[in-house]
């Protein structure tokens, strides 16, 4: 019986590239010119407070967060009701990895100036970063209520909805953000990703291409476009996009991993192996890259090397069901069926609807003359393949069950 060799890890089509460009950043434009009402609480009456505030802004923009923090604190000390200084202080604290302290400062700013949409927006960003999505959504909505044309708030509200799996709501917000700020490339990329998740590949591709038209060096958009093309069964075109993504972001391991998968799909195993190794060189703890490298080595029948990589993938990600299946395949090929059976069962315990794990387990059990258990696993595999509308594998399972029944009768 021929066993199905396991597929490349599906993680290549997740959003595993850097998301550094996928949020509009904080509202750092807390300069006085942005405040239209001269009688608002945010305006400083103390010139020294204003000078320290401006110094804080300048230092923040230069990346000197400690210096900016000190300047904003001096401004607040000189004028305790200086709402914009609290926002600036919150920004510096957040960028220093102190989100809870930042949240407190944004809330203080809001208490002093409840009409400042930027304070709600920045509070929303920080809450989202600490996975308080419902609270973040509430703040983005408050910002939008105060400023309906606030593109950044619509965009990040879309991000929060996407993180909650609310794709329709995310599309609505991204579409609104595009209407308000049509030249911001990441919005198109994010909209494309939602469409991708809905299985609308052509529409997703159109959005990724729009993102690239506004920012030709946008590595993430090239990467996502590559994923969509790969999903369409166009590995050659995917290779071109992954190569572009790598050229613009040469230290990001996800690009190399994805390029490796596209090359694997073209049957270029040596080239694929080289890309997986590059991915691992940039991130030695990249479990999926170790798994994919193992799969390529397995395809070359380099069993000891494949086993080493599958084992490493499992060490890095103990819930990596595909790695257990791959390891089981290699063990079985080495004449270690009992170890293989144990690994297949581990994969199934992690992913109970893993059709290929049941299928491969059944083959090994059949070879070991454990025919009753083999048939049970074949039937489970068939049920799952049927649900996936995988007619080819359903027919293959039927043939194997028939062979076992013929042999036992």
Question: Which ranges hold each PLM region?
Answer:
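Helix-start (N-cap) detector for alpha-helical repeat units in TPR-like alpha-solenoids
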Residues: 49-50, 83-84, 117-118, 151-152, ...
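Alpha-helical segment of the N-proximal tetratricopeptide repeat
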Residues: 47-78, 91-95, 125-129, 159, ...
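Terminal, low-structured helical/coil segments at or just beyond the last alpha-helical repeat
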Residues: 3, 10, 29-41, 367-409
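Register position in tetratricopeptide repeats
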Residues: 61, 95-96, 129-130, 163-164, ...
